[in-house]
UniProtKB/Swiss-Prot annotation:
NDH shuttles electrons from NAD(P)H:plastoquinone, via FMN and iron-sulfur (Fe-S) centers, to quinones in the photosynthetic chain and possibly in a chloroplast respiratory chain. The immediate electron acceptor for the enzyme in this species is believed to be plastoquinone. Couples the redox reaction to proton translocation, and thus conserves the redox energy in a proton gradient. It comes from the Eukaryota. It comes from Guizotia abyssinica. It is found in: Plastid, Chloroplast thylakoid membrane. It catalyses: a plastoquinone + NADH + (n+1) H(+)(in) = a plastoquinol + NAD(+) + n H(+)(out); a plastoquinone + NADPH + (n+1) H(+)(in) = a plastoquinol + NADP(+) + n H(+)(out). GO terms for biological process: photosynthesis, light reaction. Keywords: Chloroplast, Membrane, NAD, NADP, Plastid, Plastoquinone, Quinone, Thylakoid, Translocase, Transmembrane, Transmembrane helix, Transport. Belongs to the complex I subunit 3 family. It holds the Pfam family Oxidored_q4. Disulfide bonds: none annotated. This is NAD(P)H-quinone oxidoreductase subunit 3, chloroplastic. GO terms for molecular function: NADH dehydrogenase (ubiquinone) activity; quinone binding.
Length: 120
């Protein structure tokens, strides 16, 4: 039998944990100064006023490499616990991990074919 009142603590926790960040966001908006001085609008590099233009545009290649790195970094995070408990989990989990790795390899091949890994 499913009793809804058994989950009252969960719903209270969910509502409170959702309201606290929203309240903090709105309170900081009301208490923050509305006008920004010239110091807030100037660039700041290690305590020294920058010489020349401080805004540099990065090439999109940096972002592509960073994106591929993040994908494979997350893969490592998911595969490490699986590798540590491989002998306990069995063959079905091995097949699931193999499918996961194959999907990532397909993504790598796609990025490679699109030229995301070429620097020139």
């Amino acid at each position: 039998m499913f009793l809804l009142y058994e989950y009252d603590i969960f719903w209270a926790f969910l509502i409170i944990s959702s309201l606290i960040p929203i309240l903090v966001f709105f309170i900081s908006g009301f208490l923050a100064p509305s006008s920004k001085g010239p110091e807030k609008l100037s660039s700041y590099e290690s305590g020294i006023e920058p010489i020349g233009d401080a805004w540099l545009q990065f090439r999109i290649r940096y972002y592509m490499f960073a994106l591929v790195f993040v994908v494979f970094d997350v893969e490592t995070v998911f595969l490490y616990p699986w590798a540590m408990s491989f002998d306990v989990l069995g063959v079905s989990v091995f097949v699931e991990a193999l499918i996961f790795v194959l999907i990532l390899i397909v993504g790598l091949v796609y990025a490679w074919r699109k030229g995301a890994l070429e620097w020139s």
